[in-house]
């Protein structure tokens, strides 16, 4: 069983909005302001736990955008299956899954995604400093496990370009790689896109005085890296 690969052409401007505001009205307002620049939104626990799972369907209905549920699923296979099924039923197009729980837990997510026509992103390591303590040491093996399982979509840190480069080396050019940590955490858009297919930006956009201008500025900085 193999997962599908997200096509880079499907991610407008190679830019994904990370929406972690905790208020529905603010989240919808900001997304509406930047919708002309993005067509993919990563929604995480802060917004969903504050406003409920229905917010996923509301985003899809209002903006017609792809939704990646950043739930970093990390449980036993049976529980992972339930989490993924509920998330996809709520309207998410894809879900982010931790790899450190092992092949059986990841496979449970892949099976549900295939059944429901959705996608899985495998997280090999995270972008914050604490990731160096434990998960980074296993990241290469997690990536190799993903390749063995047929995973085609991955998440890697923009804050450590050398690790992003290593991840790309392991998963190959045919896999789709998205990268958080650009902006507030210090990741550089252009450097990140040397290895990743799309960057994920949150606070630098949704906390900006003018979110639309912030998004436009990021796109301007990477215009030479965008598809014609």
From Swiss-Prot:
Protein known as: Orotidine 5'-phosphate decarboxylase
Residues binding substrate: 20, 42, 70-79, 127, 180-190, 202-203
Documented EC number(s): 4.1.1.23
Source organism per UniProt: Methanothermobacter thermautotrophicus (strain ATCC 29096 / DSM 1053 / JCM 10044 / NBRC 100330 / Delta H) (Methanobacterium thermoautotrophicum)
Keyword Plastid among record annotations: no
Role noted for this protein: Catalyzes the decarboxylation of orotidine 5'-monophosphate (OMP) to uridine 5'-monophosphate (UMP).
Residue positions of the active site: 72 (proton donor)
Family membership noted in the UniProt record: Belongs to the OMP decarboxylase family. Type 1 subfamily.
């Amino acid at each position: 069983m193999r997962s599908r690969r997200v096509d880079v052409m499907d991610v407008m401007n190679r830019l994904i909005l990370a929406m972690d505001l905790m208020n529905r009205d603010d989240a919808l307002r900001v997304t509406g302001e930047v919708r002309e620049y993005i067509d993919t939104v990563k929604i995480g626990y802060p917004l969903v736990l504050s406003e409920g799972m229905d917010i996923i369907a509301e985003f899809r209905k209002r903006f017609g955008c792809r939704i990646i549920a950043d739930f970093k699923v990390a449980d036993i296979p049976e529980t992972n299956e339930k989490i993924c099924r509920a998330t996809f039923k709520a309207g998410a197009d894809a879900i982010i899954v931790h790899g450190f729980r092992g092949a059986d837990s990841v496979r449970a997510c892949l099976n549900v995604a295939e059944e429901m026509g959705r996608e899985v992103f495998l997280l090999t390591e995270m972008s914050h400093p604490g990731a160096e303590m434990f998960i980074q040491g296993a990241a290469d093996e997690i990536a190799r496990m993903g390749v063995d399982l047929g995973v085609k979509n991955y998440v890697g840190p923009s804050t450590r370009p050398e690790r992003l480069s290593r991840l790309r080396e392991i998963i190959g050019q045919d896999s789709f790689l998205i990268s958080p940590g650009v902006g507030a955490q210090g990741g550089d858009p252009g450097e990140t896109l040397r290895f990743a297919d799309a960057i994920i930006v949150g606070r630098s956009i949704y906390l900006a005085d003018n979110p639309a201008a912030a998004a436009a500025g990021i796109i301007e900085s990477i215009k030479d890296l965008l598809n014609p």
